[in-house]
């Protein structure tokens, strides 16, 4: 089980949202790179970054902070938020991002995502509300089922599927194991759970489910409901 500490970038700061609502942003650090360094020192192999401004603007907006993180930290980085064309993918990889997350574009242009997955290290972010895919920074809900979207990429060379239950994201209400397992079983691609993680019992439930490869940890760390250094020692 790979643990992915998460940092959402908004206006150059590290924040967390509740249920994806921008006006719910709570600032946890004015220097995101220092947080990433802290995760690295705890034992993180990966850190999950989301450019929130980018998700809404359709292009990365926190480049200065992303570059600063890369310059100061050796941990592997995956980045999502507003990455919707090949030039942006190449630019992110050139500045040292290890894996690019494609979200909204996966619904609107799955062929493009498959082409990119054949050339670059790509993860697909599937964010869902009541089982249906949410797009455009979670501002819209599509008519596509999350499991159907996952199946679309079954043999495309995608490195990972990151599935988020939007209704639980940032709520500390517990991870949706069943939803994550449905996605994992639908596509047979390494699947990472996201949304609602509160404490060690959530990590244990994901490990016990067998078939889920990773978990994104955000507010549970920031609010102190999960002992992250202990989790790295136990599960990494």
From Swiss-Prot:
One of the record's GO molecular function terms: 1-(5-phosphoribosyl)-5-[(5-phosphoribosylamino)methylideneamino]imidazole-4-carboxamide isomerase activity
Domain of life per record: Bacteria
GO biological process: L-histidine biosynthetic process; L-tryptophan biosynthetic process
Active site: 8, 127
Transmembrane regions listed in the UniProt entry: none
Enzyme class per UniProt: isomerase
Pathway involvement of the protein, from the record: Amino-acid biosynthesis; L-histidine biosynthesis; L-histidine from 5-phospho-alpha-D-ribose 1-diphosphate: step 4/9
Localisation per UniProt entry: Cytoplasm
GO cellular component, one term: cytoplasm
Sorted UniProt keywords: Amino-acid biosynthesis, Cytoplasm, Histidine biosynthesis, Isomerase
Documented EC number(s): 5.3.1.16
Catalytic activity: 1-(5-phospho-beta-D-ribosyl)-5-[(5-phospho-beta-D-ribosylamino)methylideneamino]imidazole-4-carboxamide = 5-[(5-phospho-1-deoxy-D-ribulos-1-ylimino)methylamino]-1-(5-phospho-beta-D-ribosyl)imidazole-4-carboxamide
Family statement drawn from the similarity comment of this UniProt entry: Belongs to the HisA/HisF family.
PANTHER family hit by this protein: 1-(5-PHOSPHORIBOSYL)-5-[(5-PHOSPHORIBOSYLAMINO)METHYLIDENEAMINO] IMIDAZOLE-4-CARBOXAMIDE ISOMERASE
Protein name: 1-(5-phosphoribosyl)-5-[(5-phosphoribosylamino)methylideneamino] imidazole-4-carboxamide isomerase
Species the sequence originates in: Sulfurimonas denitrificans (strain ATCC 33889 / DSM 1251) (Thiomicrospira denitrificans (strain ATCC 33889 / DSM 1251))
């Amino acid at each position: 089980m790979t643990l992915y500490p998460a940092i959402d970038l908004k206006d150059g700061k590290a924040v967390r949202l509740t249920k994806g609502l921008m006006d719910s942003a709570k600032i946890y650090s004015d220097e995101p790179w220092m947080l990433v360094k802290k995760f690295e020192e705890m034992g993180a192999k990966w850190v999950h970054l989301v450019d929130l401004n980018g998700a809404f603007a359709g292009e990365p907006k926190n480049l200065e902070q992303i570059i600063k993180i890369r310059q100061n930290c050796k941990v592997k980085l995956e980045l999502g938020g507003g990455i919707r064309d090949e030039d942006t993918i190449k630019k992110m990889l050139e500045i040292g991002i290890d894996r690019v997350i494609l979200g909204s574009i996966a619904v609107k242009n799955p062929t493009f995502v498959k082409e990119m997955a054949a050339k670059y290290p790509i993860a697909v972010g599937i964010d869902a509300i009541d089982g249906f895919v949410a797009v455009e920074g979670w501002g819209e809900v599509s008519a596509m089922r999350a499991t159907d979207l996952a199946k679309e990429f079954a043999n495309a060379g995608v490195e990972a599927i990151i599935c988020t239950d939007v209704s639980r994201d940032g709520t500390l209400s517990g991870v949706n194991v069943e939803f994550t397992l449905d996605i994992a079983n639908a596509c047979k691609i390494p699947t990472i759970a996201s949304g609602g993680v509160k404490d060690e019992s959530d990590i244990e439930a994901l490990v016990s489910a067998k078939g889920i490869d990773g978990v994104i940890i955000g507010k549970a760390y920031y609010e102190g409901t999960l002992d992250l250094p202990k989790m790295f020692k136990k599960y990494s």
